[in-house]
Curated annotation (Swiss-Prot):
One of its GO terms (molecular function) is (3R)-hydroxyacyl-[acyl-carrier-protein] dehydratase activity. The gene is fabZ. This is 3-hydroxyacyl-[acyl-carrier-protein] dehydratase FabZ. The active site is at H54. It comes from Sodalis glossinidius (strain morsitans). GO terms for biological process: fatty acid biosynthetic process; lipid A biosynthetic process. It catalyses: a (3R)-hydroxyacyl-[ACP] = a (2E)-enoyl-[ACP] + H2O.
Length: 151
């Protein structure tokens, strides 16, 4: 565990997110401020299982998984900002808008995920997300997540 309250290592991420291999797409939180922003990292390895078919001979990290990585970073920020969920509550990824892909992400890249809290109303929070490689925007989108009780 870390003593720096603005970073989170994988053990702490696993306590917050339900995702596990091969679908956990956040390796470490570099910095965050509750209710404001979060910066995280996803190290892209050639060993990712989807590279076998996306695409043979020209591996490219699937765009939908870049969005999922940003959504997971958003979930971590939501958990750290709003606190633990009550029994029977879940966070749901509710919407994505204005998604744009600017450059491919390839094995060996380190993807920096930056998410910013925009506003929250009646349990629905809006965020802005950007994924960057070497300072260059790979993807950007607006996202929403909803805090709801299980039916």
């Amino acid at each position: 565990m870390t003593t720096d309250t603005h970073t989170l290592h994988i053990e702490e991420i696993l306590e917050l997110l339900p995702h596990r291999f091969p679908f956990l797409l956040v390796d470490r939180v570099l910095d965050f401020e509750k209710g404001k922003f979060l910066r995280a990292v996803k190290n892209v390895s050639f060993n990712e299982p989807f590279f076998q078919g996306h695409f043979p001979g020209k591996p490219i990290f699937p765009g939908v998984l870049i969005l999922e990585a940003m959504a997971q970073a958003t979930g971590i920020l939501a958990f750290k900002s709003a606190g633990k969920l009550a029994p029977g509550e879940l966070y749901y990824f509710a919407a994505i808008d204005e998604a744009r892909f600017k450059r491919p992400v390839q094995p060996g890249d380190q993807m920096i995920l930056e998410v910013e809290f925009i506003k929250e109303r009646r349990g629905v929070a809006r965020f802005k997300g950007v994924a960057k490689v070497d300072g260059e925007v790979a993807c950007e989108a607006s996202m929403m997540c909803a805090r709801r009780r299980e039916a």
